Amino acid sequence: MTHIKTTIITAVLLIGIAFPAMAQIGEMRHNFAIGINGGVNLNKVSFQRKIKQSMPMGITGGLTARYISEKYFAMICGAQVELNFSQRGWEEAFELSDGTRDLSRSYSRSMNYIDIPFLAHLAFGKDYGVQFFINLGPQVGFLIGESEKASGWTAEQIASAKEYGKKIENKFDYGITGGGGLEVRSKKAGSFLLEGRYYFALSDFYHTCKKDDFDRAAHSTISIKLTYLFDLKK
């Protein structure tokens, strides 16, 4: 896991170095836009020891600001930052001895975060019309609330599961996020963006030392969102 984290961080740093270097030789732009975004999260948690899970849905939404700095041949380059509310967590999947779903028991944990992604924005297409874009960069978050639901369990069974009733120990979260989508951009109506994005947490929300219950406890989230932006400066 340490090797994976190092590789991901190195890749992001290289992108960060290459991005401003490209900006020095491209056709300059000074487009600044702000707007709103909203969508859904499909959530899972990477646990070691492994826990069978489904992918519960949560909501995400917030504010977006984007600055387009230059156009390098066919590629439009810029930077984007967001301030989002995001529902994450996990839902456990239980099975009977014959492999079918056990509907008599359930457990889920909902975790609400304020997320701030810092993204390199790369788009391909004309200045106005349809563009394909890629967003990639680091993300930080802070837990602002959590809740859990359980049914079909005895007190002894709940006590035997390490994650049940266990409060989140690390409220600060960080990782890498990236994705792509389509943008429809017009001169008068602003920009409409449809995006799919994946978040891979590099931090753990439980302590993960040898003496602790888990070796890994990190978020993994797929987001599908719509964004509307209007230009403050073209």
Task: Please state what every model-predicted region is.
Residues 56-62, 76-78, 111-117, 131-133, ...:
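Transmembrane beta-barrel architecture of outer-membrane proteins
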Residues 23-66, 229-234:
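Short glycine/proline- and aromatic-enriched beta-strand/turn motifs that initiate or cap beta-hairpins
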Residues 24-31, 70-77, 125-131, 186-191, ...:
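Short loop/turn motifs that connect adjacent beta-strands in outer-membrane beta-barrel proteins
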Residues 96-138:
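Hydrophobic, well-structured mid-protein blocks that either form specific transmembrane helices
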Residues 29, 88, 173, 178, ...:
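Predominantly the C-terminal beta-signal and adjacent terminal strand-loop region
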Residues 44-55, 88-112, 143-173, 204-221:
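Extracellular/periplasm-exposed beta-strand and loop segments of Gram-negative cell-envelope proteins
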